[in-house]
Amino acid sequence: REISMKILCVSLGCDKNLVDTEMMLGLLNRDGYNFTDDEQEADIIVINTCCFINDAKEESVNTILEMAELKKTGTCKALIVTGCMAQRYQQEILEEIPEVDGILGTSTYDEISNVLKRVLGGEERVSCFHDLNCLPQTETGRMITTGGHFAFLKIAEGCDKHCTYCIIPSLRGSYRSVPMERLVKEAEQLAEQGVRELILVAQETTLYGVDLYGKKMLPELLHRLAQIPGIYWIRIQYCYPEEITDELIEAIRSEEKVCHYLDIPIQHASDRILKRMGRRTSQAQLREMIGRLRREIPDIALRTTMIAGFPGETEEDHQEVLAFVDEMEFERLGVFAYSAEEDTPAAGFADQIPEEIKEDRRDEIMELQQEIAFEKSESMVGRVLDVMIEGKVADEAAYVGRTYMDAPNVDGYIFVNSGELFMSGDFVRVKVTGASEYDLIGEVYDEFTK
């Protein structure tokens, strides 16, 4: 037990990767390591990488190179690289960055302690990769890094969808659900640590259970999680539109703790492009599904993501997207300019779109969404909502919080004017008094609802 050793963990990329980082922190904590946020005093640096799109790849490479320098200038004795980039570019990283001492794939992060022991014991260039389709064992509790009052619960790993632009199946393997009992136990541990909001994540949450139980079990999982004392909000992200069932809609509607919020990445609205993307929905099906959600759960907040400038996208296709966004009026929308990823079918399509056009189209969609978001925000004025307090605004009698419509890190906030003392994680009733494009302003209507 190297008790005196200090570890810095750098987590890049998505919330699913963050869960893996928190799992590794839990294992390292169990084995007696200390932690630091200061790269200058770290004895060991672990970088959990991302390479989903080119920008993420660059960030991962730059972070590795930056931290590699600390082996010369700082106290760093061991540099370990994990995650998606390690999975994809194992050979290149070992060949081109000699400072890297250990490397682990996406399905072996539970080996972090063993790899560290081997590295600290003098073994060079330790490499740990198992079958991509195994599920790491995570009986040890996680160390929460999100501030304590919300946590991501990763309910499945991998993906079987094989969209033509996406490398996730080759980085994360085939779809495999985490057994329900294990998830319930993990959620109970999180609640005991003070977590009040669970955010369910996976590459695709709506298929949960199909591989283990022979049918979709997300509704059943929601019912089980809703019974855990101390959990007040359950939020679902990464839903595939074609997998949303009547049972799921009913579970969202009937379980009080499940937020009336769904993140449903649709990626496009032109049938021609959806087909080229390998997506399994048509515009008509998307329209029907969104209409059904709005009818069944009138106050639902819908978030989606779209890709602008996919290979072969014409101006006509782009106009279809704009018309669809205008008609559907999503509460939340993120748009990415298409990024060609090597080894994906779409990267080999002949009709790639120039960078400038991709960015112009992305900006055009976002400008339209900004108008929609402002109208949506303004329509909230006068409503009274439960707000989870995130923290205090420095030097002001005000707090920052989130409503059920806001997932952390990706959506907006509500600024709550109050001289009273609230703690992060408190739920407060707030009357909305004003709005900007993506954020709301309000005042305390009735304190401490939960």
Question: What do these predicted regions represent?
Answer:
Residues 2-208, 247, 262, 284-291, ...:
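Proteins enriched for Cys/Gly/acidic motifs involved in redox and nucleic-acid/cofactor modification
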Residues 7, 44-45, 151, 198, ...:
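Conserved beta-strand core positions
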Residues 51-52, 172, 212-215, 275-281, ...:
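Short glycine-enriched, charge-decorated loop/helix-capping segments at active-site entrances
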Residues 79-83, 88, 93, 192-316, ...:
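Conserved SAM/AdoMet-binding glycine-rich loop
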Residues 97-98, 119-122, 216-218, 252-254, ...:
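Short, hinge-like loop/turn segments at secondary-structure boundaries
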Residues 183, 200, 236, 264, ...:
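Conserved, mostly hydrophobic/aromatic
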Residues 202, 238, 266-268, 304-308, ...:
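Active-site proximal loops enriched in glycine and acidic residues that flank catalytic Cys/His/Asp
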Residues 348-450:
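Terminal RNA-binding accessory module
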